[in-house]
């Protein structure tokens, strides 16, 4: 569960290292984001000499949450950290690589490009 002011790791090579969620998209009263939801975030830590700089506002999709999600078959999946992938206006990733595992729920949410770049889909 990602709420505003939550710090997330970045799971791609877009140049950002840490993001802070400032808004959860998807309705005027939606307060928390789960895996596959789009958020507006601010870059809090960045790699030098890369396109994304500190204090840039970006769109990102949540790919891992520490709280986890329960699937329809009853299994429960939980990750070690909260992580997101930076995306552009067309919902394509801005980086060319994705690090770490991602959840299978991204495929249902039409983020197939992120799923294909990921080394492991759980």
From Swiss-Prot:
One Pfam entry name: Ribosomal_L14
The keyword Iron-sulfur is assigned to this record: no
An example Gene Ontology CC term for this record: cytosolic large ribosomal subunit
InterPro entries reported in the protein's UniProt record: Ribosomal_uL14, Ribosomal_uL14_bac-type, Ribosomal_uL14_CS, Ribosomal_uL14_sf
Predominant cellular place of this UniProt entry's protein: plastid
SUPFAM superfamilies registered for this protein in UniProt: Ribosomal protein L14
CDD domains xrefs: Ribosomal_uL14 (cd00337)
Signal peptide: none
Keyword RNA-binding: yes
Molecular function terms from GO: large ribosomal subunit rRNA binding; structural constituent of ribosome
Family from the record: Belongs to the universal ribosomal protein uL14 family.
Protein name: Large ribosomal subunit protein uL14c
Organism of provenance: Tupiella akineta (Green alga)
Taxonomic lineage: Eukaryota, Viridiplantae, Chlorophyta, Ulvophyceae, OUU clade
Gene expressing this chain: rpl14
